[in-house]
Curated annotation (Swiss-Prot):
Ranges where the Glutamine amidotransferase type-1 domain occurs: 293-535
Gene (name only): pyrG
UniProt keyword Magnesium present: yes
Top-level taxonomic group: Bacteria
Protein name: CTP synthase
One CC-aspect GO term: cytosol
Remarks, miscellaneous: CTPSs have evolved a hybrid strategy for distinguishing between UTP and CTP. The overlapping regions of the product feedback inhibitory and substrate sites recognize a common feature in both compounds, the triphosphate moiety. To differentiate isosteric substrate and product pyrimidine rings, an additional pocket far from the expected kinase/ligase catalytic site, specifically recognizes the cytosine and ribose portions of the product inhibitor.
EC primary class: ligase
A Gene Ontology BP annotation from the UniProt entry: pyrimidine nucleobase biosynthetic process
Residue span of region Amidoligase domain: 1-268
Residues involved in ATP binding: S15, M16, G17, K18, G19, I20, D72
Active-site residue numbers: C382 (nucleophile), H509, E511
Length: 535
């Protein structure tokens, strides 16, 4: 079977949920027995989002092979339950840098390097590479931003050319457009959707399907009007309405026959998607019997997207305990030893996620200290693990001024130090310890029990600093347990205090591998204990 290509674009405005549409369609097609992969095109000039501010971009999602990517890849993985790779996120910066490198090497043999054909050819190559490296039957490529944006023009042209290159039966264009709801007048307006589809046609692409983003349902008459003006079959005009839970969306799209229309267009003979298990999960999620409050102490809490995988992993873990997770967003900059009880005291558990830089670290340390002294279930992630070690060094071992070398290069007690292979690294981007690495688990530890007594777990990392092994013996003597280490025993991966209800911190990012129907084990145990603690 020829590889099938589905392109998801957006018009009118950005942030309409194109990624959720792509992820939901991917789940439906996977449940038809098809092998699906998904890809995100980001037209910005950064090589990747690794050095971008979380306030600008939100979370950086890390793949198994160590690519720093757009947060939409997290949605793709969680919805479809697949592991993506470095070819699943392509930026203008990445493409242009590769082309310029080739030009400097003389690989274009003296040709004038241009947007067409050189940039468009490389974009088409990236699409095909993402499909071939995963042996996918179908690749869904989402283009970030809005059709008509100056920076996205080469991407749209590459998508246009794909139809002629691989055949009309192997390509489908899905355009996501907004329907404006004027609440005061009680009216729905379609002109933005019509003009957005017209703009796509001006670039040579006729949409095969429209997905209408709306707060309220659209009438059949309005659907038919949009279909006529946009030259799309009425049955291929799909509504994507606001929902209580994101995981309802695949079911809503299936109810409108979206996946069957896609299969018909692409000449795919695939059985109907069996969504029984997914539907049962959604029913469970919408009828949780318990509630648990978790304090998330972070430095980017004004933008929840900066912690989207963390919050989703907490929710997934809550599902397994039949509990809705109520997140109390606590700005680490506001936390002190004096007010920490007021800010986190009503929480049944505390999570201290990752981050970079000095701002907010003392507040995180105060929250960790509060959790340790009051036996509140605590989970530390990445920097959260490093600061767990710093707090223990200061307040249990009595090492006044102990810190991470990253945050205080003058400290007498650098309990967190730079990794040996990072000492001479000058570039910030793409140089961290990234991707999937193993952690060997200690017998009898809380971590090993959480992971069902596995000997080794593989989890994704994103860090440059590590626990300083010069202090390991002193920590162990004081009851600090190193419950997960690298197979060569050199890198600390998990730490815990065994005399607490749950006091565990890990260097890796377990949330990146959590799924709604398969929650990550460390998060699951954390929430289970927090639910018990809230009784």
């Amino acid at each position: 079977m020829s590889t099938k290509y589905i392109f998801v674009t957006g018009g009118g405005t950005s942030s309409m949920g194109k990624g959720i549409v792509a992820a939901s369609l991917g789940r439906l097609l996977k449940n038809r027995g098809l092998k699906v992969t998904v890809q995100k095109f980001d037209p910005y000039l950064n090589i990747d989002p690794g050095t971008m501010s979380p306030y600008q971009h939100g979370e950086v999602f890390v793949t198994d092979d160590g690519a720093e990517t757009d947060l939409d890849l997290g949605h793709y993985e969680r919805f479809i339950d697949i592991n993506l790779n470095k070819y699943s996120n392509v930026t203008s910066g990445k493409v242009y840098s590769e082309i310029l490198r080739k030009e400097r090497k003389g690989e274009y043999l003296g040709a004038t390097v241009q947007m067409v054909p050189h940039v468009t050819n490389m974009l088409k190559e990236k699409i095909k590479r993402a499909a071939t490296t995963t042996d996918a039957d179908i690749i869904i490529t989402e283009v970030g931003g809005t059709v008509g944006d100056m920076e996205s023009l080469p991407f749209i042209e590459a998508l246009r050319q794909m139809k002629a290159e691989v055949g009309a039966d192997n390509v489908m264009y899905i355009h996501t457009v907004p329907i404006l709801h004027l609440r005061a007048a009680g009216e729905l307006k379609t002109k933005i959707a019509q003009n957005a589809t017209k703009t796509l046609r001006e670039y040579g692409i006729q949409a095969n399907m429209l997905v209408l983003r709306s707060e309220v349902p659209i009438t059949t008459e309005m659907r038919d009007k949009i279909a006529m003006f946009c030259d799309v079959a009425p049955e291929a005009v799909i509504q994507s309405l606001d929902v209580e839970h994101l995981y309802q969306i695949p079911l809503n799209l299936q109810a409108q026959n979206m996946d069957q229309i896609v299969c018909d267009h692409l000449k795919l003979d695939a059985p109907k998607a069996d969504m029984t298990e997914w539907s049962a999960m959604v029913d469970h999620v919408m009828n949780l019997k318990k509630k648990v409050k978790i304090a998330l102490v972070g430095k980017y809490v004004e933008l929840p997207d900066a912690y989207i995988s963390v919050t989703e992993a907490l929710k997934h873990a809550g599902y397994s305990s039949d509990a809705e997770v109520d997140i109390n967003w606590v700005n680490a900059n506001d936390v002190t030893d004096e007010n920490v009880a007021e800010l986190v005291g009503d929480a049944a558990g505390i999570i201290v996620p990752g981050g970079f830089g000095h701002r907010g670290t003392e507040g995180k340390i105060a929250a960790i200290k509060y959790a340790r002294e009051n036996d509140v279930p605590m989970l530390g992630i990445c920097l959260g693990m490093q600061l767990t070690a710093v707090e223990f060094a200061r307040n249990v071992l009595g090492l006044e001024g102990a810190h991470s070398f990253e945050l205080d290069p003058e400290t007498k007690y650098p309990v967190i130090d730079i990794m040996r292979d990072q000492v001479d690294v000058e570039d910030m981007g793409g140089t961290l310890r990234l991707g999937l690495y193993p952690a060997k688990l200690k017998n009898g530890s809380r971590a090993k029990a959480a992971y069902n007594d596995a000997e080794v777990v593989q989890r994704r990392h994103r860090h440059r600093y590590e626990f300083n092994n010069k202090f390991r013996e002193d920590f162990e003597k004081a009851g600090f347990v190193f419950s997960g280490v690298s197979p060569d025993n050199r890198l600390v991966e998990i730490v815990e205090l065994s005399d607490k209800k749950f006091f565990v911190a890990c260097q890796y990012h377990p949330e990146l591998q959590s799924r709604p129907n398969r929650p990550e084990e460390l998060y699951t145990e954390f929430i289970r204990v927090a639910v018990e603690n809230s009784k």
